[in-house]
Structures are given as structure tokens and as C-alpha cells.
């Protein structure tokens, strides 16, 4: 296939027991997410009185409905930790591996709580993130040995820079990653002891340090400034150069390209390590790809082996110890834990090449990347999977011509059941960035309210636990837009 596979691509029914990936499969014509029957979230009341029910729900739920499946986050973290542990053992790699959650992908409380509970270190990038870290400290969820990585722009005197100093007083393992020399005075004058990271300008395709310097990116320090910053940190009382940060891209699905981009940063780390022996962590940042379509193919173990082996080779050449490895996993951690379910409310032929299935929500508001970037996500029916399919187009309920799926000019076909009564469908792999970009509890395009949200977890015995968060009310939407506020108007004469 030369196009992203976003769902079923045949007119025939889907066989019972068919598995789309490691968490979506078919049971008697209905779609299951792990052990959760998604169809029965909506159809419970329509089945026999003694039919399936879920503890804590016991009734049909409204559509649209957002699903937050927390066990998936734990599975993803555990899987990556196991991958790097296997690679370390196979290669005899002397350094450690640190898994950090990049919180900008999804900063919801239940997500942060789950990542910390799964043993992840914590990465942040804004002043509000610092407040979140304080809340996690107060609740006993951020242990003293857990690293907090402070990325983002934080010039001296800004609220973010000042908040980092406050957090350092409460949490010892805080590492500010310097983006610009203007960030150093706050650390130098604080009277506090800091382990410090330096972000190198490494983003984008390159084969050596010169090409990294030439690339047009606002992130990180160029080579000359990097070395200058390292000397300042090393000479400063109370500061210790600890981390080199070299992020090279986002959603990099080609292992060869990923390692090719990381090689010059690893060489820079080794040269720095020759001069500054306190430097011990190589942080490759983000870029780890996540499966958002059904054709996803990336060998995480092969990547880990290649990365560690490359570090061994380069560090051996420069006669320095291999570094501890850190990755900041945002999309990888959260993409698959989130899904968004809708009901097909009408079908329009409209003399189109394929019939329009109109859903009871907005595609472009719920998944901004579909219209802004032409991004693809998995779309599957929850019901009627044992019935014939046809190729269709999806339309959102808004009056916007961009509220469609597949994205405009996409080569990917979308097939859904011909039978449309009680036809529910889900978008999957949408748990990273989409809700944050769309604005949580904010005002949506065409004044659509935010959907209800079902948070799903499991206890130690594997029993499901549910928490249903109500969607926005009309009053909340109007209040966001200022209609429930009495405004003082001041008239002026010209």
C-alpha cells in the first residue's frame, strides 16, 4: 500500500475475531478496545435487560463521547522500558535508560498522574507546567528521585524562569535545559545548586555539525554558543553540566534516518564529555513515532539497538564513557490511549463520488491536525462490522467545508457499513495533541459543546473502573463567550 491505511478497505464484512492492531478487535460484529466493548457503551439500553453492563455505568452513554483509556499509557511506558533494557543487556551497554513523559502532548491530570505512577520522569515547557508539578508533589505523586526536565524558552525574569527557581527549592532533581544564554543569569544569581542541561540546535536533517548550524530552527544553541554556555556552567559555583539535549525531529518512522540525524549530536556529546566530565546524560528528546494508522511499521527494539551501538562506537572513538540515555516520549505515550466516538446521524448522496456520512460532532474541531496538517487517524465502526461495507466520506456537523475526513486530497479510502441505523464509529490514535490544540473546555468552532468524557482504568485485579465527566453545557459555552457576563461599557466622545 502506498497510502495511509485508516480502516477497513473492503466491501465485505469483517470476520469475527479480526484484530486491527494490539488493542482493536472484532467480537460478533462489534468493536472492542482491549477488553472494553465500545458498542455497548451506547447500545446497552437497547439490548436485553440482563445484557452486558459496565460497573459504574449501567446505562447507555451520550454521543459524542471521548474515551481516555489509562491502561494503554502504562502499557506503552512499560514496553519502551523493556525494549531499552533488552538492548542494554544484549550490547552490554554500561549506561542507564530514562523514560521521560513530554507533557505538552497531553497535560490532563489523569494522564500526568498515570505517567508518574508508571515510573516516568517528567518533562515540562511552561509556567503552568510548574504549577502542575507542585500539585503532583503535594499529592505525593512526584518522588524526590524523579527527574523534572524544564524545556522551553525561559529568559531571566520571566514567570517561567522564576517558577523554576521555586520548584527547585521544593524538588531536588530539577534540570533546566538552556535554550539561550539569556536563561543563565537566573540560575547563576539564584544561590541554588542546579544540574543543567544544554539544548543543541540539532533539529532537522543533517550529516554534521555545520549542517546543524545552517538549519533554520528557533530551538537550541548553535555550536559556538553551545560551547560558550558549557564553559559558563562549568565555571559557575553551584552549577553542574549534566545533560546534552539533541532533538532531531518529530514522528520519525525511518530508523536509518533517525540514527543518521542523531549521529552528529552524539559526536558533539562525546567531544563535550572530553572536556566536562560531569556531563552524563544524552537526551535525544522526542521524535519517537506512534501508530496513528493501521499500516504503521517501526521496530522500536531495532532503533534502541542502533542508538546504543552508535553511542558505544562514537564514545569509544573519543575515549569517553557512554552516556545514560533519555528520551522524551509525548505522542508515543499518549496517542493510543485516546479515542473519540460519534454517531452517524444522516447520509447524503448529493451526487458525490461516495456518499456522505454525517456525524454528530466536528472532525476539524476534535482533531485539528486533520485539516491543518492533513494528518490521518484510524476510523472504524463500533457496530455492524458483520455487515457489508461501502466507500464513504465523513462530514462533521459544522457548516465548514474543511470539516471532512479523510483529509482533502488524501489518497486513503474510508469504508464503513452500508447499514446506518445505530451506526457508531470511532477515531483512534488521537490521544496526543488533538485535545490540547483544540482547547480543553474552550469554545469550539460553530459553537459546538465539548463532548462527554469517559475515563477508563483498571484495578489490580483487572476490573474496569469508570469515571464519566460531563461535557459542556449550553450555559458553559455561553459563559466562555461572554454572554453571561455583565460588561461595563464606557462611552467616550471624540
What do the predicted segments below correspond to?
Residues 73, 104, 126, 198, ...:
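Conserved, mostly hydrophobic/aromatic
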Residues 247, 281-289, 322-334:
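A glycine-rich phosphate-binding loop feature that marks nucleotide/adenosyl-phosphate handling sites
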Residues 245-249, 282-287, 390, 395-400:
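Short connector loops at secondary-structure junctions
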Residues 92-281, 290, 310:
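Active-site-proximal beta-alpha core segment in soluble small-molecule metabolic enzymes
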Residues 11, 38, 57, 306-308, ...:
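Charged (often Lys/Glu-rich) extended helix/loop segments that serve as interaction or gating elements
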Residues 63, 89-94, 275-281, 317-326:
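Flexible, glycine/charged-enriched surface loops at secondary-structure junctions
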Residues 253-260, 291-303, 334-346, 409-411:
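Short glycine/threonine-rich loop-to-helix capping motif typified by GTGT followed
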Residues 1-157, 379, 391, 405, ...:
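N-terminal capping/small domains of soluble enzymes
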